[in-house]
Amino acid sequence: MLKIAVYIVSLFTFLEAHVTTRNNQRIEPLSDEMISFINEHPDAGWKADKSDRFHSLDDARILMGARKEDAEMKRNRRPTVDHHDLNVEIPSQFDSRKKWPHCKSISQIRDQSRCGSCWAFGAVEAMTDRICIQSGGGQSAELSALDLISCCKDCGDGCQGGFPGVAWDYWVKRGIVTGGSKENHTGCQPYPFPKCEHHTKGKYPACGTKIYKTPQCKQTCQKGYKTPYEQDKHYGDESYNVQNNEKVIQRDIMMYGPVEAAFDVYEDFLNYKSGIYRHVTGSIVGGHAIRIIGWGVEKRTPYWLIANSWNEDWGEKGLFRMVRGRDECSIESDVVAGLIKT
């Protein structure tokens, strides 16, 4: 009976935190009122601020491009690992950037711009990290988000969204060429869309209101790049789902490098500035894919350390932290990764 009572109290607390409004009235998303509500909330654990990345809720929905696979899709497409054979001690703090300092890509923050390609960015970022990590620094390749969004038809609809797991399957089956940002213009197929600014003042142009269309698939490299398209491809050896278990996810990161994860984005997240995010208020907006690079504990609150794809001016220098170990916003339910072909 005691266990049931504790469960009911815990459930009530959870639901209360997820439907909280001011004076029982819905708070307008992206508004100053929502920002104030979050910053004044005693249990939020994070700070909100004004952002120009999203001009409206409809605008934000378009850019939330991570689609969820159902259980059958996951089961039929790739195995799920539980790492029961990995007997490694899990530290309270772990940062892939410090573990593998020779792999500079781990510290890199990309920008998907005005395109719902987060599913592709989370994938190529983690793949890029893993190429360096799993080769012991012997290989280095910045994989192209453009090649993935334009040529992987099974993945989804490019700038209109896609499946993170299928991106990893594509890496194994078809391979992905290299490609940096529009600004550095490196590799076979650099990203065609510019980095854009989240705030009124900054070093990048304003994000604007234009939503980019998915580029056509071109199996050629940019002019002046010497390696042919097919020869520039890098392949994975295996793609897999990571079991919905905090310790399994941690072990996978410790052994093989950052992973890609997708989570449910609520209205309050659109104003995230700093701290350890947990859902405080607002309805669901859509799905977003990111790269988990580590974890830690602050003031007894465990968190995931996460790299976003909205450039380094957003959040904590391009990163954010989210409560760990309770599947906050389903972030531990949709984790995918893979091994490189050696």
UniProtKB/Swiss-Prot annotation:
Its EC number is 3.4.22.-. PROSITE patterns: THIOL_PROTEASE_ASN (PS00640), THIOL_PROTEASE_CYS (PS00139), THIOL_PROTEASE_HIS (PS00639). It is an enzyme of class 3 (hydrolase). Disulfide bonds join C103-C132, C115-C159, C151-C217, C152-C155, C188-C221, C196-C207. Pfam families: Peptidase_C1, Propeptide_C1. One of its GO terms (molecular function) is cysteine-type endopeptidase activity. It comes from the Eukaryota. GO terms for biological process: proteolysis. Keywords: Disulfide bond, Hydrolase, Protease, Signal, Thiol protease, Zymogen. The keyword Metal-binding does not apply. Residues 1-17 form the signal peptide. Intestine (gut). The active site is at C118, H288, N308. Residues 18-89 form a propeptide. InterPro entries: Papain-like_cys_pep_sf (IPR038765), Pept_asp_AS (IPR025661), Pept_cys_AS (IPR000169), Pept_his_AS (IPR025660), Peptidase_C1A (IPR013128), Peptidase_C1A_C (IPR000668), Propeptide_C1A (IPR012599). Belongs to the peptidase C1 family. This is Cathepsin B-like cysteine proteinase. It comes from Schistosoma japonicum. The lineage of its organism: Eukaryota, Metazoa, Spiralia, Lophotrochozoa, Platyhelminthes.
